[in-house]
A protein has these predicted regions:
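Charge-rich, well-structured scaffold segments of protease-associated domains
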Residues: 1-140
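Short, intrinsically disordered, charge-balanced linker/junction segments flanking boundaries
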Residues: 140-146
Length: 146
């Protein structure tokens, strides 16, 4: 199983796999960050656009967007997580790449493994795979409140 979710402060990737496949999972997922492939993202964009359209029919989502827009004016929290309709219709690959390079850095990452995994072995594999990521200076987001 593989899934992802986006919040205001995080992007989460969820996976379920047998412990015997840990090395394969680490290979695949470290490559996602070490050598990302930015190609046409139309298929995923369609999924996000469907989510956006569904959110426009959900009272709670509309209320939350309205509340955050007025509580945090000018802050990224004031914008809907899914973005604006016009941005979804005309996405810019360059903007996606810039965002990725700014925020998807080792200093902003956390890896959590749960299950029947041997810690010492897992740590060696993790350091071997993810240790190839180049350290970056993490950006500081805007303060929520002053």
């Amino acid at each position: 199983m593989l899934n992802a979710a986006t919040g205001y402060d995080e992007t989460m990737y969820y996976s379920s796999f047998p412990p015997s496949q840990l090395y394969k999972w680490l290979d695949l997922n470290s490559e996602r960050f070490i050598n990302p492939v930015f190609r046409a993202f139309q298929p995923e964009l369609e999924t996000v656009y469907e989510e956006f359209n569904r959110s426009q029919d959900m009272q709670g989502s509309l209320q939350s967007d309205f509340m955050l827009k007025h509580i945090f004016p000018g802050h990224p929290y004031s914008r809907a997580i899914l973005g604006l309709q016009e941005h979804l219709k005309k996405p810019r690959l360059g903007g996606l790449v810039d965002f990725y390079k700014s925020w998807y850095v080792p200093e902003n990452m956390v890896l959590i493994l749960v299950g029947n995994i041997k810690l010492k072995e897992a740590m060696g594999l993790i350091n071997d795979r993810f240790g190839r990521l180049n350290p970056q200076k993490a950006l500081n987001g805007k303060p929520i409140l002053k």
